[in-house]
Amino acid sequence: MSYFDDVYCGLCKDILENGVQVHNRTGIDTIKIPSAHFHLDVSKEFPILTTKQLFIRQAVTEMLWIYQAQSNDVRWLQERNVHIWDKWEINEDGDWIDENTGNVLKHFDPSFAHTIGTAYGYIVKKYDLMNKLLNSLKNDKEDHRRVISLWQDSELDTAVLPSCVWSSEWDVTDGKLNIWVHQRSCDVPLGLPFNVTQYAVLLMMVAQVTGLKPGTIDWSIKDAHIYVNQVDGIKEQLNRYETKGSLPAPELWLNPDITDFYDFDPTKDVKLNGYEHMGKISFPLAQ
């Protein structure tokens, strides 16, 4: 059975039972706990939920947009039929618009049109973070300074949203690649399932091209929350878990011929084998 479902449903239950309802910038209250942490062993099980369906192609494509294409251009995703970031796209006038009121939430230089500003892939490219990581893993296995930080103070004012998953630390122990991921704010129903699966794929890809085996993921969250308009969906998912348990975790296949991280194609080189799930649950997405 899927261990990630155990971890995830336990977290959701903790938030509903012990969380505090608070106001926030979106105008939709959240139920939150201040922090959460969990540990996953990717060498034993690929972490993807079975108590609801997760769309692996979209998840991997978004991850590669950040770390492979190193882009902040929303059109790159749209061309691949991924619309995760549409709500945060800067328009041609340089405005980020409230989808409900039409008001300008933030104004940018028009040169940032069709992007999310200076966040995520923009940071990876500007600071050459991915190449530095790959070079370190190939040439200095005992390097203790392997940190990818998407939180750069000088870039925050020109980002639509500062990176939520903002940091990862990379370790090599006994031939296995391990990461510790830090998340400053977490939409647990929508963001967390995607994010964990994405970083598991990233871990496996990086391990493959650097001659290592995938190891563990430690995940730390500050402000783990469920929006109040997502509670019914989470209760449905918890009911599935409590009445049916979870299903066997699938296996992720990566094309073994790929030796360069930048050659991975999510449509050809990444496959999920044996993925059983209990069906889709739709959650509203707060802007």
Residue ranges and their predicted role:
Residues 1-287:
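Terminal, non-catalytic protein-protein interaction segments that mediate quaternary/complex assembly
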